[in-house]
């Protein structure tokens, strides 16, 4: 604007605009900084900082790929359903059941075969499911007795090679497998059993302190009350040493050894000890007239060919 002296003075109208921009920048910066601090503070309490690991152990998954190399492409694998899709995806091989078919009657019989102490029964169940499947189960389900008789006396032989594929996750899932497989189809009800992993802070030749219990290895007693029937040392899926305590009944301690170190201690009852899963997968004990071991990748997995041909 002009003054009375004919001179002009500089305009100050742009100063408020500059100040407004500056204040706006300060507000935005403060907002973003505050949000950043907020998310940093809560990240430890939420899933933001959580990076999930693989759902299948990489060591176990590597054995899927090895199985693919060792069996004919037209083979079928009897295993637990949880990894059915993953196994088929990795190997191209068929499985007896998977996440889409775990509610079928096959699942009951597979579970029954795994927890059975009779390797003949697992052999018969596998043969029946491979040749008759759910259709045969439905046709013979006129009574519980008739169905069990049909499954235990299969008439046909499988055309394609059949394999049993045990995987380490089945140890942790044994309780669920046992709950299904022990179902009494005549009277109803089941008696689930499982593996109890013991956390030990002392192991000597004479005693063990595990999960708050004192285990006397001379007398074969837990807390001087519960009897132990045997103790088994396992390395690479084979029995390294077995010690009997002289009790007619009792629990079994299974100690898994890697190198010279005890890496896992399991407490199980007699039915779990005698189960096909425990005997074949963990102890490496199997009927050579019925099964042939094809691949031992213990502690991750183990593969057996069922001798039908």
Predicted region positions:
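Extracytoplasmic
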Residues: 4-11, 23-309
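Compositionally biased, intrinsically disordered low-complexity segments enriched in Pro/Arg/Gln/His
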Residues: 14-21
């Amino acid at each position: 604007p002009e003054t009375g002296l004919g001179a002009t003075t500089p305009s100050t109208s742009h100063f408020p605009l500059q100040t407004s921009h500056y204040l706006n920048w300060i507000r935005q910066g403060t907002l973003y900084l505050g949000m950043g601090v907020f998310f940093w503070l809560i990240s430890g309490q939420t899933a933001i900082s959580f990076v999930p690991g693989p759902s299948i152990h990489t060591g176990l998954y590597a054995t899927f790929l090895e199985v693919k190399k060792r069996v004919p492409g037209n083979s079928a694998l009897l295993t637990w359903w949880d990894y059915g899709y993953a196994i088929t995806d990795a190997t191209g091989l068929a499985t007896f059941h998977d996440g889409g078919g775990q509610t079928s009657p096959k699942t009951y019989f597979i579970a029954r075969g795994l927890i059975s102490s009779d390797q003949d029964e697992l052999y018969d169940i596998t043969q029946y499911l491979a040749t008759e499947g759910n259709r045969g189960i439905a046709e013979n389900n006129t009574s519980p007795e008739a169905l069990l008789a049909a499954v235990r006396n299969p008439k046909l032989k499988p055309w394609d090679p059949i394999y049993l594929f045990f995987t380490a996750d089945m140890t942790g899932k044994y309780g669920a497998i046992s709950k299904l497989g022990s179902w009494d189809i005549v009277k109803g009800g089941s008696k689930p059993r499982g593996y109890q992993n013991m956390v030990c802070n002392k192991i000597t030749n004479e005693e063990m302190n595990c999960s708050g219990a004192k285990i006397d290895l001379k007398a074969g007693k837990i807390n001087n009350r519960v009897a132990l029937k045997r103790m088994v040392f396992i390395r690479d899926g084979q029995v390294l040493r077995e010690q009997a305590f002289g009790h007619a009944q009792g629990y079994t301690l299974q100690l898994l050894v890697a190198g010279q170190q005890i890496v896992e201690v399991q407490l199980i009852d007699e039915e779990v000890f005698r189960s096909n899963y425990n005997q074949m997968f963990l102890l490496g004990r199997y009927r050579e007239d019925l099964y042939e071991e094809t691949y031992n990748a213990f502690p991750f997995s183990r593969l057996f060919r069922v001798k039908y041909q």
